[in-house]
């Protein structure tokens, strides 16, 4: 699933459309994670795109007539193409603009979303429950320690909770915990303030590094311009089971947390060896 860096890379790739006017909205397949509203062609026709911003893993497109909320799901892409580009099998939604370009939703698994939010997108039920933006100043060590002080769940699971902090999925949680030297099974409430500060710092740095690399392209992700990301080439632990740690040469191990594969270095991330770890 695209995480914060991939969504932000996509948003930035669509920015050239700001100021353009919609000439046509085309719904080819309305059956996404939630049905694409059938009235979108009417409310978007003739509307100018005013703003593109990100909230967590959602992109909010503000038009003169209201706001679209876009989510890439597990395998979705938003492509910026020429309007005469012939649609492919999994191209489900188009926005054609007067300047001759089209924003196209491509989603083989159809877990993505195209929703209408009117004039108050932040009050939408999907957005108003979201936690802190990890790159904002408000997400700091003191905030994290206060938020997790009563939580006994593993810190890896907690840092992926979008009600606490948004956009930190499986890849970037694993990478950030490695950089911070924290075992993923550590109970969240056991972290000291110093550890919370270090973890917050590494979350921010990891996400910023991923943004600079254009995100991670493991299977489905490509930016709006069709280019892949390259951050996967620098992973410390994610997907590197059995390979030597880039720091200490210890083989990377994997365990299951919350139905997710969690990668870590047993030497660099000290903690009680977990019973369900697989070398």
Swiss-Prot record:
Keyword Metal-binding: yes
EC number: 3.2.2.23, 4.2.99.18
Zinc finger (FPG-type): 236-270
Biological processes per GO annotation: base-excision repair
Gene Ontology MF, one: damaged DNA binding
Family annotation (PANTHER family): FORMAMIDOPYRIMIDINE-DNA GLYCOSYLASE (PTHR22993:SF9)
Subunit structure: Monomer.
Family: Belongs to the FPG family.
Protein name stated in the entry: Formamidopyrimidine-DNA glycosylase
